[in-house]
Amino acid sequence: MPMSTSCPHQPYCEMREQTDMRFISHLTRNTFAIILAGGRGTRLKQLTDFRSKPAVPFAGKFRILDFTLSNCVNSGIRKIGVATQYKAHSLIRHIQRGWSFLDGRFDEFIQLLPAQQQIDETQWYQGTADAVYQNLHFLRRYQPDHILVVAGDHIYKMDYGRMLAHHVKHHADMTVACIDVPLDEAREFGVMGVDEQDRVIDFVEKPQNPPAIPGQPDRALASMGIYIFNTKFLFEQLERDAMTKGSNRDFGKDIIPYIVPRYRVFAHRFADSCVGSDNHRPYWRDVGTIDAYWEANMEMTKVTPELNVYDRDWPIWTYQEQIPPAKFVFDDEDRRGTAVDSLIAGGCIISGASVKRSLLFSSVNVHSWASVEDSVVLPDVDIGRHAVLKRCVIDKHCRIPEGMVIGVDPEEDRKRFHVSPKGITLVTAEMLGQGAAEGR
C-alpha cells in the first residue's frame, strides 16, 4: 500500500490552536479554490438553453454561483479559479461585473479558466478531474499548500476554513464534505461509508442501491462535491488518472474510489461548518430540476426562511445593477398595487396589481389587475393587464400578453410551455414566440 503523503502543517496539528481563527486564516491564505462551473444543467430544461446552471438566477437577486464564491471569500480563500465550459457567456459577464473587487496587490483574484483544449487539441474538459488537470500549469504557478475543489451549482453557506482545520487535524490526504440525505435520493450522489473516526472506507458514485447509514436505514451519507486535497497529492493523483486508460476523468467515478483504500481520506460533516443553520437542519440545496428550483425559491418567501441572505456576518456578494427602488402604485378598491410574502427586487413596478408568495427579480413590470401567485419571475419581464400567473417560473425578457392565464390549466399550458412533474409551468421568451435569448 502506498505511503500517505506527509502533511505540510504537521507541527500545527500538535497544537490546540488548530481551530482558532488565526490558525484557520493561515490555512485559508495558502489555499487555492477551483470552482467547477461548467455544468449543462439539462434537468432545468429550457431555463439552461442559453446559460449554464451556475448562472441561473436565484432568490430574487443572486446567481447560483454567488453562493460558492461568497463562501470562498467569506472563508478567507481569495485565490480562486472558475472553470467554465458550456454556455459560459452570461456567467463570465456576471463575474466580470460583480466580482472585480478582489485586490491583486494582495494576491487576491478570481481567474476564469475556460475550457480551451489545453492538453489535447481535440478535447475540452472531459470530467470534473480533467477540468482541474488541464489547469495544473496555472496551479503550479502559485504552489498553494491545499486545493479546494468545489462545485459551483449548489445553494448553501459554509465556512471552508473549518473544513480545512479538520483536514489538517486528521493528517488527511483528501477530505470530502458530506451530508446525510434520504435513501431514495442518494442515487443522485456519491455515497460513502465511514468508520468511527469518519475515515472514508467505501465510496460509490450514484449507486442504484445506495447503502444506508448504520442505525439509520432511511438515510445515506452523500458527498457534497466539495473536496480538499494536499496539493502535491492532488497533482500526483491527477497525473496518474490522466495516464489511466478508460478513466472517466471524474473525481466521483475514478479519483475517489481509487484513493479511498490506499490513502487517508476523511469525511467532513457539513453540520460542523455550515453557517447560519442553528435552528434548522444544515441548509444545502441542489436546485437541479424545475421543481427543486421553484421549491427552493419559494422557501425564501417564508417569514423566517432556513437560508438567511440577510446575515451581515456572512454576506452573499453579487453584481448590483444601478436601478431605482421598487415601486407600488394605485390604491383604489379594485386596483391596488400590493405584494405579500414576496421578495421584490429593485426596478420593479407593481402598478395596481397583486403579488403573493412570489419572487420578482429586477425590473419586472406588473400591470393593473394582473395577479402573480407562487411564482418566480426573472429580470426584465413585463406582465400585461388582467394576466394571471400561478406556480410559474418565468424566464428573462418575457412579455406576458394582456389577459393571458398560465398555471391554472396544465393541459392547456403543455401545448405551449413546459410543465414539470409537480405542475410548475416554465415559460421562456422563445415559447411565447418572442425571439432572441439576449443577455441571459
Curated annotation (Swiss-Prot):
Domain of life per record: Bacteria
Keywords for this protein: ATP-binding, Carbohydrate metabolism, Glycogen biosynthesis, Glycogen metabolism, Nucleotide-binding, Nucleotidyltransferase, Transferase
Assembly and interaction partners: Homotetramer.
Pathway given in the UniProt record: Glycan biosynthesis; glycogen biosynthesis
Function: Involved in the biosynthesis of ADP-glucose, a building block required for the elongation reactions to produce glycogen. Catalyzes the reaction between ATP and alpha-D-glucose 1-phosphate (G1P) to produce pyrophosphate and ADP-Glc.
Transmembrane segments: none
Family of this protein: Belongs to the bacterial/plant glucose-1-phosphate adenylyltransferase family.
Reaction catalysed by this enzyme: alpha-D-glucose 1-phosphate + ATP + H(+) = ADP-alpha-D-glucose + diphosphate
UniProt enzyme class: transferase
Gene: glgC
Name of this protein: Glucose-1-phosphate adenylyltransferase
One Gene Ontology biological process: glycogen biosynthetic process
Gene3D superfamilies in the record: Hexapeptide repeat proteins, Spore Coat Polysaccharide Biosynthesis Protein SpsA, Chain A
Keyword match ATP-binding: yes
NCBIfam families per the UniProt record, alphabetical: glgC, PRK00725.1, PRK00844.1
Residues where alpha-D-glucose 1-phosphate binds: Y125, G190, E205, K206, S223
Entry annotated with the keyword Transport: no
Molecular function per GO: ATP binding; glucose-1-phosphate adenylyltransferase activity
EC number: 2.7.7.27
